[in-house]
A protein has these predicted regions:
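Helix/loop segments that flank and initiate small ligand/metal-binding modules
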Residues: 1-35, 101
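Short, conserved non-catalytic motifs in the polymerase core
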Residues: 26-35, 73-88, 113
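Residues that mediate protein self-association or partner binding, especially
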Residues: 31, 35, 102, 106-114, ...
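Cys/His-coordinated zinc-binding microdomains
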Residues: 32, 46-49
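Short functional micro-motifs and their immediate structural scaffolds
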Residues: 36, 50-53
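RNase H-like, metal-dependent ribonuclease domains
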Residues: 79, 116-142
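Short flanking/linker segments adjacent to small metal-binding domains or redox-active Cys/His motifs
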Residues: 86-102, 108-112
Length: 142
């Protein structure tokens, strides 16, 4: 569902909200360096780029040349560096789970006024999750 919401443009990021309401601060709540858009938040924010790089694939999101969220989502559906279907599915699932975690972290920073704790997100969604072989546990089916 998260991947679909990003691709369809249904994420309530600050760039979208500011078109209708004067929200004041339009900057990314995680890095405070750029205007918050879906593409920035999920792919180019320095905080989230570190999380992608911490994955077992060592993804450097800025090296893929995404120019839109459609490019970003298409990358997960057809990754250029993976041939086996099971590995493609694993990357897609990882992308969806990490995007969900990024969105939850963003909302905690904005609405719960919690400090940014990247280390916790990396532990929860990063390489440790994938080293546990939870895909083989039968809990998730693609």
């Amino acid at each position: 569902m998260m991947i679909w919401r990003i691709a369809a443009g249904y994420m309530s990021t600050k760039d979208k909200l500011s078109r209708f309401v004067d929200i004041g601060d339009v900057y990314c709540p995680l890095c405070r360096l750029e205007i918050e858009s879906s593409l920035h938040l999920f792919a180019f924010c320095p905080v989230t780029k570190a999380m992608w790089f911490n994955s077992k694939w060592g993804l450097r999101m800025d090296s893929f040349g995404f120019s839109s969220v459609v490019d970003f989502i298409q990358f997960f559906c057809s990754p250029p560096f993976i041939n086996q279907l099971s590995q493609k599915n694993e990357l897609l699932l990882f992308g969806a789970i990490l995007c969900d975690g990024i969105w939850k972290l963003r909302n905690q920073v904005i609405f719960a006024d919690l400090p940014l704790r990247c280390d916790e997100l990396n532990l929860e969604y990063g390489s440790n999750l994938w080293n546990s072989n939870f895909l083989d546990s039968g809990l998730f089916r693609l």
